[in-house]
Amino acid sequence: MPASISRSTYASMFGPTTGDRLRLGDTELVIEVERDLTTYGEEVKFGGGKVIRDGMGQSQRTRAEGAMDTVITNALIVDWTGIYKADVGLRDGRIAKIGKAGNPDTQPGVDIVIGPGTEIIAGEGRILTAGGMDAHIHFICPQQIEDSLHSGITTMLGGGTGPAHGTLATTCTPGPWHIGRMLQAADAFPINLAFAGKGNASLPAGLEEQVRAGASCLKLHEDWGTTPAAIDCCLSVADRMDVQVMIHTDTLNESGFVENTLAAIGGRTIHAFHTEGAGGGHAPDIIKVVGAANVIPSSTNPTMPYTANTVEEHLDMLMVCHHLDRSIPEDVAFAESRIRKETIAAEDILHDMGAFSVISSDSQAMGRVGEVITRTWQTAHKMKVQRGRLAEETGANDNQRVRRYIAKYTINPAIAHGLSRHIGSVEEGKRADLVLWQPAFFGAKPDLVLLGGMIVCAQMGDPNGSIPAQPYYSRPMFGAFGGALHASAVTFVSQAAEEDGVGERLRLQKGTLAVEGTRDIGKADMKLNAHRPSIEVNPETYEVRADGELLTCQPLAELPLAQRYFLY
């Protein structure tokens, strides 16, 4: 006879199932399980007296016969594709199958085979997401990578050479020599990396050599002169060599206004950094570009979300990051022109509408590398509190909003930079760059981070304890060491560099993967974040209107996922 148990008992044993709801961290965001790919009564679970034992949930099948390397059991997947429960099978560092795990010789409907060679990660009661991607990195110091990885980011893209003054201000790794050295340095780190060359030039040769050397993209930055000629030259090279271009436009409007920049771009695909403008760009109306079909607009996290302290801290940040001097009136005026509470407030709302597509950090250059994920969910919380449920929500949940916001640091930056065949979502065939969270700590502290199917960091207690005892904090794991590091992580390069054998030429120990498909995309390709409102900015009051509607909201004085989570 079938047995019946209460929902609460079931959830405590196997995790939530279809129709169950749970809160994310201490936010006001509530998700509901949309479907469950496991089978009631045939769930697999590891442990003493549990299902995954020889002849029961574990089959006799070898790896050659299809058994998985690792199975994550009963996980609640939170992804742009949906919010659902499933077992996840990993093989060769990729997601082989999402469905029902077990022993096909004793259980029905099994499409993920557990064998003697299969490791188990218990996903019951945990949330599984894709590893995050931070697409705006100043590689100022290598210690950033640890902070980023332990926050749930598994891919970092940007430029720099260390604390050189060019890197302190701009996300560029300039020239073939520096690109080669940074590609070699990447071998030391348990994270996927990609480097941006300097895109500011009026003739193509200096840009082409950087792409051939291994730059996966090119960065136009106003501190190097983002003129119409440089924009056109850079995009022409990118179109020929299939790499993305990121742009930090001309705050001072010296070489033109936002309309001139859009004319120079000429309808070609471009990723616009900190499109609100506090991080830099045409003052006061760079935010207009969110309405362009060819522009992928992103935010950096210091303005996300708008709080009581946002404006005050920005002036000091800006003076330091852009090598400005408080004793020079022009430098102070430059800084003040970029910090506008009206456009910062509008940015939150435009994210909630799906008009901004990406969130990134701007690490140590007006951004916090370990807070991309936290600030994304703080913004989603703020908008839920201030704007209520999205009109498109169904049921007593925030699933649509949650799917929209998770896309901003997973699939959308991956699409923008030609990496979505490999990363960006929990889908079969993609790299097993995955993050497991306890729901109470979601967005603040990951439980486990996997890179290429190997655990690279995790919450861990006292190594000398008889059991892993408190205090728990995030520590590197075996996947972050030795040859496992090189087998788990990859470095993304241009197709030209991949075809030229950059890995062999530089004797790289990590594998390399080529970016692809960066030029035939646009705003419409941004998952759940493709809205294109017509934006107007009042040049005197800085008020922002979208399709005629005034966009304004109040700063919050208190946020979730904050001090109560970070005692140590």
Curated annotation (Swiss-Prot):
The modification N6-carboxylysine is found at K219. Heterotrimer of UreA (gamma), UreB (beta) and UreC (alpha) subunits. Three heterotrimers associate to form the active enzyme. The lineage of its organism: Bacteria, Pseudomonadati, Pseudomonadota, Alphaproteobacteria, Rhodobacterales. It comes from Cereibacter sphaeroides (strain ATCC 17029 / ATH 2.4.9) (Rhodobacter sphaeroides). PANTHER family: UREASE. Binds 2 nickel ions per subunit. Signal peptide: none annotated. Gene3D superfamilies: Metal-dependent hydrolases, Urease, subunit C, domain 1. Ni(2+) 2 binds at K219, H248, H274. Keywords: Cytoplasm, Hydrolase, Metal-binding, Nickel. Its EC number is 3.5.1.5. This is Urease subunit alpha. HAMAP family: Urease_alpha (MF_01953). GO terms for biological process: urea catabolic process. Pathway: Nitrogen metabolism; urea degradation; CO(2) and NH(3) from urea (urease route): step 1/1. It is found in: Cytoplasm.
